[in-house]
């Protein structure tokens, strides 16, 4: 199991996050503790500590570290929170979330990715993360409500069924927009008075697709 970058790369990794505005110490600590090289293909481990997205299996990507840190910071997580992640991918984002919350349920439509992520998370003792093969547009009925929801693939719009899974005072972070162009990262807060939406930054994510993958 990889153990993270050598000291110079580790220092530059943290410095790059701080320079780009990440200031939440808990988020920075989680980014420091989770070895990103454990979540990429063996031939890409030399690139794992660069601030860039990398390809993974099933035509998907592992997001660049700044985007992971930024989305996590915008969630305003607390240790008692229960989190839903739509799009497990490599499992890297779930590992970060596991350091900052009580429990994480992460859904992945590709069996290959779900199996790989489950093994990686187990190796890192992320025991509060449950990986399920599932459709992010149809969250399982037994899942209950969540304090925070994060979507790691682009939705053309956030479905009402997903907002229904958000508890009062909950926050949802998702890239929203067309699949073949730049999207907008949205932060949605649910309160007794209704739904509040805030546009954050422009992003580019792979598309979120309904249903389970027929292959892979």
Swiss-Prot record:
Q: Please tell me whether the keyword Endoplasmic reticulum is annotated for this protein.
A: no
Catalytic site residues? 63
Q: Name one GO molecular function term.
A: protein-L-isoaspartate (D-aspartate) O-methyltransferase activity
Q: What class of enzyme is it?
A: transferase
Q: Which Pfam families match?
A: PCMT (PF01135)
Q: Does the record's keyword annotation contain Amino-acid biosynthesis? A: no
Localization annotation: Cytoplasm
Q: Which UniProt keywords apply?
A: Cytoplasm, Methyltransferase, S-adenosyl-L-methionine, Transferase
Q: Which GO terms describe its biological process?
A: methylation; protein modification process; protein repair
Q: Which first-to-last residue range defines the signal peptide? A: none
* Matching CDD domains: AdoMet_MTases
Family, according to the entry, reads as follows: Belongs to the methyltransferase superfamily. L-isoaspartyl/D-aspartyl protein methyltransferase family.
Name of the featured protein: Protein-L-isoaspartate O-methyltransferase
Tell me which species this is from: Rhodopseudomonas palustris (strain BisB18)
